[in-house]
Amino acid sequence: MGVKYLSKFGSEKNRILTGYVGEKIIMDYLGIKKDSDDYDFDLISKKGKRLEIKTISCKFKPKNDYFCTVNSHDLNGVHKQDADYYIFLRILNNYSSGWILGWITCDEFFKKGKFVNKGTDFGPFSFIKANATILPISSLNQFT
């Protein structure tokens, strides 16, 4: 595995697998045949839009007031990937079930989302590794 391959999802094997499972779910759901696997986006839609798929594992079905998170590796602010849309998913730790939470334009995500500095204790979880922008699942658009 090259550096780009590992840096895309982080170096943890489970995160890499979870990320690719999420991409495959969206490819099947939207009828996309090829994974782009670019640093800034994962897939290209049939309409030519760049899609960044954000998938995390979980222990149970997420609630609408839970957050979707986009981490930033820019230590001084927000690093925005060069994509048109974010699509968020959650997958059970044992991979038995998953949920497509919704989609949002990248610009809208950062306008509506709340920026959280690295090291911030945010209630039930902390942002230890990176700055992040968060947005409640309920703020996402649903696929129809």
Residue ranges and their predicted role:
Residues 1-49, 54-144:
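Nucleic-acid endonuclease domains
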